[in-house]
């Protein structure tokens, strides 16, 4: 089972920053989940929201900034003074820093401004084909499908919305044609659904789990990965995965 650090160890450090990613590595996470978008000058940056307002000292849409402009913003002070000066990283910088240390679960954001992001991310990942483990995912099923068509050797995942119900056999068959994993909100999962998904040839990630008892229950039910803000408190193989 994969322990997947949600935007890094974001329970302890500002999300989607090198500080959060370094901490995830120290906490022995198996993967880092992160979000990518394209800048005005078509550079791939790691940030969740379509605007910079919540997680930086700037204001405006990511798509309206060049990379140089974005990297002048402070992406850490909003979380705490200890993280002042953290910057929005590029996906390339993240791959260079971590490709031999930890896997990446890369979410393609589905904003209208992100046309062509599948090609951009796939080309970059091709330069790091010797990485430990990379998986590309999205809430936008067409984006995952497009990525699979372009880069069939790179594993993919579909993320389902919180209100997504029980997957039908036809839905699972459709997903299986372009994805290896289904990433489902943990409150929607039960033993019956997990068994059904596995029987239909898909692996399962559960997002976002920040309760130890819930994590243990999901592990016992057979999920293949747990996405969490606190990768150090997940119990794996009978042991805490601590620093």
Curated annotation (Swiss-Prot):
Catalytic positions are: 6 (proton acceptor), 48 (proton donor)
Cofactor requirement? Ca(2+)
Catalysed reaction, written as an equation: a sn-glycero-3-phosphodiester + H2O = an alcohol + sn-glycerol 3-phosphate + H(+)
Q: What InterPro entries does its record include?
A: GP_PDE_dom, PLC-like_Pdiesterase_TIM-brl
Q: Which GO terms describe its molecular function?
A: glycerophosphodiester phosphodiesterase activity; metal ion binding
PROSITE patterns recorded: GP_PDE
Disulphide connectivity of cysteines = none
Give UniProt keywords alphabetically: Calcium, Glycerol metabolism, Hydrolase, Metal-binding
Class in the EC hierarchy, top level: hydrolase
Binding note for cofactor: Binds 1 Ca(2+) ion per subunit.
Residue ranges of domain GP-PDE in the record = 1-238
**Pfam families linked to this entry:** GDPD (PF03009)
> Binding of Ca(2+): at which residues?
33, 35, 107
Q: Which domain of life is it from?
A: Bacteria
Q: Which GO terms describe its biological process?
A: glycerol metabolic process; lipid metabolic process
Keyword Hydrolase listed? The answer is yes
What are the EC numbers? 3.1.4.46
Q: Which family does it belong to?
A: Belongs to the glycerophosphoryl diester phosphodiesterase family.
So what does this one do?
Glycerophosphodiester phosphodiesterase hydrolyzes glycerophosphodiesters into glycerol-3-phosphate (G3P) and the corresponding alcohol.
Query: Per its record, how is this protein called by name?
Result: Putative glycerophosphodiester phosphodiesterase YhdW
Q: Which gene encodes it?
A: yhdW
